[in-house]
């Protein structure tokens, strides 16, 4: 199976130098709709597509891969990418650029946000895979860095080799983080050894779990691309972890004990994003009807509190048979190319960051 990890290791990013393009698509009730007239979604979760939301110039604020987005307490949308001319781009909800910074994260990938004593802080993940000036793919251990929203570094989490948490032959290429209500930090080592690393709020290591070598294979993670704290049950918070190569999420207790598996057939899901009573996720790849992973594919998915898929914008409508979700496919409209992350605002609009998508900026979906 082709994974993003092997893709990065074997070649420079395919998006370099390509021109942005938009494919025409079908709208609900209008099969001749142009891309920005398109309505996508299912079961009341329907959205108008806006490819031109981000009002930036490629000459002054270029993007390579748009990886993750969060919204701060001021309502601003913060994007991380891997172009070191501006790793961080900050927009208002209309798509106007408000600020940009960051020149030292060549593999800028993960972005989470927390609020402490009235101030917003970011956790930036550099996964360690990057492309040098000659276009060659390179690798180094990754890092997780806490900053404020202006880019001032607060601390860097210790790498697991330095604290005896990893063996010498275990790779460390983190992809994403989650922050618990008590400030504890969970790091998903999705392109490395597939552990979830647990630190306290000061960056002191507590434990690790997951990986690929458990006696019970259900406890394993394969491309542990994302992690989120699910607080919908106020008395029983849990961790939702991505196992992207298995097309599923796995649920663990806050101290790493396995609870259950949530299958998403045909959906190579990225990080879970909690918003209200729903889980949202980008689907970085989807499969064809023979189960083969499709390049240039992907969509989004929306899941309820019972872990039932309600809608897959950009994909086919969810179908259940005898309570079992059937495979979901990319819709023929092909709205998305490698949906890597979503950010959902207070109006239920969704901002979609895409990887390897011809240097395109985030797409906005306005709920209708």
What are these regions (language model features)?
Residues 28-50:
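Blade/loop signatures of beta-propeller domains
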Residues 54-60, 154-168, 172, 206-219, ...:
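Surface-exposed loop and turn segments in beta-propeller and other repeat-based domains
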Residues 267-316:
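Loop/turn-rich, solvent-exposed surfaces of beta-rich toroidal or solenoidal domains
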């Amino acid at each position: 199976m082709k994974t993003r990890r092997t893709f990065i290791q074997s070649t420079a990013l395919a998006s370099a130098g390509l021109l942005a393009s938009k494919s025409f698509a079908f709208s609900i009730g209008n099969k001749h709709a142009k891309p920005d007239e398109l309505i996508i979604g299912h079961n009341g979760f329907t959205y108008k597509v806006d490819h031109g939301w981000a009002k930036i110039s490629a000459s002054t604020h270029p993007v390579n891969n748009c990886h993750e987005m969060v919204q701060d307490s001021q309502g601003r949308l913060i994007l991380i990418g891997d172009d070191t001319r501006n790793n961080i781009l900050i927009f208002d909800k209309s798509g106007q650029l408000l600020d940009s910074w960051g020149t030292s994260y060549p593999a800028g990938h993960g972005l989470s946000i927390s609020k402490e004593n009235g101030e917003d802080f970011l956790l930036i993940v550099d996964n360690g895979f990057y492309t040098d000036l000659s276009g060659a793919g390179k690798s180094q251990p990754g890092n997780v860095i806490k900053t404020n929203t202006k880019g001032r570094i607060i601390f860097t989490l210790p790498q697991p080799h330095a604290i005896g948490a990893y063996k010498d032959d275990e790779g460390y290429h983190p992809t994403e983080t989650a922050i618990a209500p008590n400030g504890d930090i969970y790091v998903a080592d999705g392109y490395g050894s597939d552990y979830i690393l647990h630190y306290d709020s000061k960056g002191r290591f507590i434990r690790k779990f997951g990986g690929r070598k458990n006696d019970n294979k259900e406890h394993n993670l394969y491309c542990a691309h994302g992690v989120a704290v699910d607080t919908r049950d106020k008395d029983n918070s849990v961790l939702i972890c991505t196992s992207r190569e298995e097309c599923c999420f796995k649920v663990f207790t806050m101290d790493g004990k396995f609870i259950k598996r949530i299958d998403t057939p045909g959906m190579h899901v990225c990080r879970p994003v909690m918003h209200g009573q729903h889980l949202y996720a980008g689907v970085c790849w989807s499969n064809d009807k023979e189960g083969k992973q499709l390049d240039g594919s992907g969509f989004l998915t929306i899941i309820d509190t019972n872990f039932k898929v309600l809608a897959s914008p950009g994909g086919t409508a969810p179908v259940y048979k005898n309570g079992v979700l059937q495979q979901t496919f990319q819709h023929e409209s092909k709205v998305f190319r490698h949906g890597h992350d979503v950010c959902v605002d207070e109006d239920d609009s969704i901002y979609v960051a895409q990887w390897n998508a011809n240097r395109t900026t985030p797409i906005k979906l306005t709920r209708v």
